[in-house]
């Protein structure tokens, strides 16, 4: 089963930036009920989509205070556990981050290691810009798209 997930958050001054499981010092953070980690959130959505388990909002809704301020890594770890509990194994997740900053390439391998450990399966990350187009191009926020491959095992 293949699932696709997306997430988008605007920048919010006064918050730390968490992206792809990493904290990015000296960067403006993203708004959100949790830590705003668009890469981790898109990966969660992709997992839930692949296994027909709803989406990030239905699994970790803003009405549930347990998830307020939660890290994207914690959400992704929990998402992977729920997918396995539903009878699926995770093959891999691929994440594409869309935004002008931070410069992702220098920390890509570090992010992949953290996210792979959270999922218990390979996670690859890439980043791109929109060449000045749209809200990410204007530097107003960051978006991410993820694809997950899951296999029913029971």
Swiss-Prot record:
Annotated site residues (Transition state stabilizer) in this chain: 33, 129
Domain of life: Bacteria
Keyword Lyase carried by entry: yes
Residues reported in the UniProt entry to bind 4-CDP-2-C-methyl-D-erythritol 2-phosphate: 7-9, 33-34, 55-57, 128-131, 135, 138
Organism whose genome encodes this protein: Thermobifida fusca (strain YX)
HAMAP family the record matches: IspF (MF_00107)
Protein name as it appears in the record: 2-C-methyl-D-erythritol 2,4-cyclodiphosphate synthase
Annotated metabolic or biological route of this protein: Isoprenoid biosynthesis; isopentenyl diphosphate biosynthesis via DXP pathway; isopentenyl diphosphate from 1-deoxy-D-xylulose 5-phosphate: step 4/6
Assembly behavior: Homotrimer.
Function: Involved in the biosynthesis of isopentenyl diphosphate (IPP) and dimethylallyl diphosphate (DMAPP), two major building blocks of isoprenoid compounds. Catalyzes the conversion of 4-diphosphocytidyl-2-C-methyl-D-erythritol 2-phosphate (CDP-ME2P) to 2-C-methyl-D-erythritol 2,4-cyclodiphosphate (ME-CPP) with a corresponding release of cytidine 5-monophosphate (CMP).
Enzyme Commission code: 4.6.1.12
UniProtKB keywords: Isoprene biosynthesis, Lyase, Metal-binding
Pfam families per the UniProt record, alphabetical: YgbB (PF02542)
UniProt cross-references to SUPFAM superfamilies, sorted A to Z: IpsF-like (SSF69765)
Cofactor needs: a divalent metal cation
Protein family per UniProt: Belongs to the IspF family.
List of residues binding a divalent metal cation: 7, 9, 41
